[in-house]
Regions:
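Aromatic-rich, lipid-facing transmembrane alpha helices and their immediate juxtamembrane interface loops
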Residues: 1-184
Length: 184
């Protein structure tokens, strides 16, 4: 929808298929939705870690488990998208003010993540996860998510993308601080 109509992600944009590994469908590299699916899973696991439960069994947290991961996804996108634009992996017909990324792209990711999580919550099962799983094994995706913005800040600084670099570092520090506060 976004590449053809310009809706959702801040205007018409296109991917540079020469820089995207693997196959594509309708000029959208499959690695993009696969990557974002993995990121959403990592973010959900992180939210489980800081909320002190399982996202499958937090019925009173429905709104939190829709909004918090959506906001975290946008914060991560503030770090990752400037790198991709700088590497010319994708571009918009009308460049945005934030390192070439239009503001509405971030609104689009907030909405898209919220919608994906809403559908997930509608169809989730009551599958019981073994409670005897080791803490680090169970929460390794969430722990990795804590580090991801800091890891992404390095290429930001290497390319002179200072604001996304600092956002990445501060974001990681905040994520780690929340985990420490919630698990002490």
């Amino acid at each position: 929808i976004g590449t053809k109509t310009g809706l959702i992600f801040g205007g018409k944009y296109e991917f540079n298929l020469k820089l995207s590994p693997g196959p594509s469908i309708s000029r959208i590299p499959l690695i993009i939705p696969l990557s974002w699916s993995g990121l959403i899973y990592m973010i959900l696991n992180y939210c489980e870690l800081v909320l002190g439960g399982s996202f499958y069994f937090l019925p009173n947290q429905n709104i939190t488990l829709l909004f918090l991961p959506s906001i975290l996804m946008v914060l991560l996108d503030l770090v990752l998208d400037p790198i991709a634009v700088d590497e010319k992996r994708w571009s918009w017909k009308r460049s945005g003010a934030y390192y070439g990324v239009p503001f509405l792209n971030f609104v689009g990711w907030l909405f898209t993540t919220f919608l994906i999580l809403f559908v997930f919550r509608l169809f989730q099962s009551d599958f019981n996860i073994d409670k005897e799983v080791d803490f680090f094994f169970k929460h390794s995706p969430g722990i990795l998510f804590c580090l991801l913005p800091a890891i992404a800040s390095r290429p930001c600084f290497e390319r002179g993308l200072k604001a996304p670099g600092f956002i990445g570092l501060l974001f990681s520090l905040g994520l780690v601080a929340l985990v420490v506060m919630q698990n002490n």
